[in-house]
Amino acid sequence: MKRVRTEQVQVAVSCYLKRRQYVDSEGPLKQGLRLSQTPEEMAANLTVQSESGCANAVSAAPCQAEPQQYEVQFGRLRSFLTDSDSQYSREVMPLLYPLFVYLHLNLVQSGPKSTVESFYSRFHGMFLQNASQKDVIEQLQTTQTIQDILSNFQLRAFLDNKYVVRLQEDSYNYLIRYLQSDNNTALCKVLAVHIHLDVQPAKRTDYQLYASGGSSRTENSSLEPPEVPSPILQNEAALEVLQESIKRVKDGPPSLTTICFYAFYNTEQLLNTAEISSDSKLLAAGFDNSCIKLWSLRSKKLKSEPHHVDTSRIRLACDTLEEEENEEDNTGTEMKILRGHCGPVYSTRFLADSSGLLSCSEDMSIRYWDLGSFTNTVLYQGHAYPVWDVDISPFSLYFASGSHDRTARLWSFDRTYPLRIYAGHLADVDCVKFHPNSNYLATGSTDKTVRLWSAQQGNSVRLFTGHRGPVLSLSFSPNGKYLASAGEDQRLKLWDLASGTLFKELRGHTDSITSLAFSPDSGLIASASMDNSVRVWDIRSTCCNTPADGSSGELVGVYTGQMSNVLSVQFMACNLLLVTGITQENQEH
């Protein structure tokens, strides 16, 4: 009864399809649905599914090429692979042997004799060095007709079987891009009909790499060459190429830095110092009239945060504590004036996050300015004479100062007294600088020496002598290996901190050097001088050629402009060199 009902359903469906004018609708219904498969049929279906795909479909369209094009296309592929030094070209190179054999056999079957001889004589020499290939190549020379091919067991095996070539997925894509770039119909036909490309996945696990060591060749793939495992995995080879490229960049000539110059015009009061914040958003300048001027270098104006306590006023019980709104604080301005010192301001330093500013003055004090409210929040006192310079440690945990009292002092932001006193110089401490690891502090003095101190112990660990005048500027290389010093003797000296000896002496300036800065990669150093020039030096250079002006051979660039005084140089993280200076008074805007 169940069978009759199934037949009734099929008849009803067939009638419906006929009314809808579907062609050959009875065939599939009469065949019925097969619910079982033999193991042989299942294996055949799985093989078809695994073998069919874009990896093995090099050319889906029928390809026909003139016999004369065989030589042109094969020669073009050989030149493409041999001229390239990439890893992909080396992996595709074994494909040339089966391509040559099959192209030659196709020419024997369909091409004129002159074309066959020309093709063989031009390319057969590149395969004679391989012993396993030499025998087949020599047999091709005596093959002139189809009967010669059929009578030769090895050549007939080439036509009866597909030659297997294993390629990595990246190398396979490399080959496909080449085949699509020009007319390669003869090559595409051979690849589609006679060659099986076994494409390996690009990424494999360690277990898969271990498991793939066994042979998976079948009886029909007896022509497949033995697979030689690569001694270097693909990712290791790529890493070596990357490291070699990085080494060539490091050892190569440096790229000249871009210089951005900030000029000060109409400085009625004498300008002593200028510095730019690490994020290039703020510019601070200290003047002889005791004030500090702060500029915004971006479109955003300087706006004070609301503060709820006014310490300059005494509130009475009957007063209403209403905030007095300042229109300037609400809208913001491009410049703020910070007042608090009672003497010339000699140095300023921004915190790493630009949230605060330190300044030192002739009034023997150091002041901390909150850049949120633009007010002086802390006063540090301890020096007995004017303070010439301040510097902040890399993580803004400590700061140091140098003074006319011949000492340098270590401070913390939450203490108004010094934590350490570094005594040992015989004259003023003109400049101070923290090492990148914050464990050491360098000081330069009018006594013509540079000292390196242990920041925690407070003792001197290095003494560098050799300058012929006061030392006015110091700078550590970011890698922590070198210390640069310069001053009134017009010489820039590089000291090796590990050995405590002089590494290089750079000459070229004609006046006192006032500022130094290392590039982020420690390969370049910039120096600013009172001779109104900025010079950039390559400290990695070993060139002994001296320029005509007598400068050191390490000089790679000189910047001179309409300046009367260069105040400072600073390298940014993007290899941008920021320079601040005063323009000549006769220079117009």
Swiss-Prot record:
SUPFAM superfamilies: Taf5 N-terminal domain-like (SSF160897), WD40 repeat-like (SSF50978). GO terms for biological process: positive regulation of DNA-templated transcription; regulation of DNA repair; regulation of DNA-templated transcription; regulation of RNA splicing; regulation of somatic stem cell population maintenance; regulation of transcription by RNA polymerase II. One of its GO terms (cellular component) is cytoplasmic ribonucleoprotein granule. SMART domains: WD40. The keyword Metal-binding does not apply. One of its GO terms (molecular function) is transcription coactivator activity. It holds the Pfam family TFIID_NTD2. Keywords: Nucleus, Repeat, Transcription, Transcription regulation, WD repeat. WD repeats lie at residues 266-305, 340-379, 382-421, 424-463, 466-505, 508-547. Belongs to the WD repeat TAF5 family. The PCAF complex is composed of a number of TBP-associated factors (TAFS), such as TAF5, TAF5L, TAF6, TAF6L, TAF9, TAF10 and TAF12, PCAF, and also PCAF-associated factors (PAFs), such as TADA2L/ADA2, TADA3L/ADA3 and SPT3. Component of the STAGA transcription coactivator-HAT complex, at least composed of SUPT3H, GCN5L2, TAF5L, TAF6L, SUPT7L, TADA3L, TAD1L, TAF10, TAF12, TRRAP and TAF9. Functions as a component of the PCAF complex. The PCAF complex is capable of efficiently acetylating histones in a nucleosomal context. The PCAF complex could be considered as the human version of the yeast SAGA complex. With TAF6L, acts as an epigenetic regulator essential for somatic reprogramming. Regulates target genes through H3K9ac deposition and MYC recruitment which trigger MYC regulatory network to orchestrate gene expression programs to control embryonic stem cell state. This is TAF5-like RNA polymerase II p300/CBP-associated factor-associated factor 65 kDa subunit 5L. It comes from Mus musculus (Mouse). The gene is Taf5l.
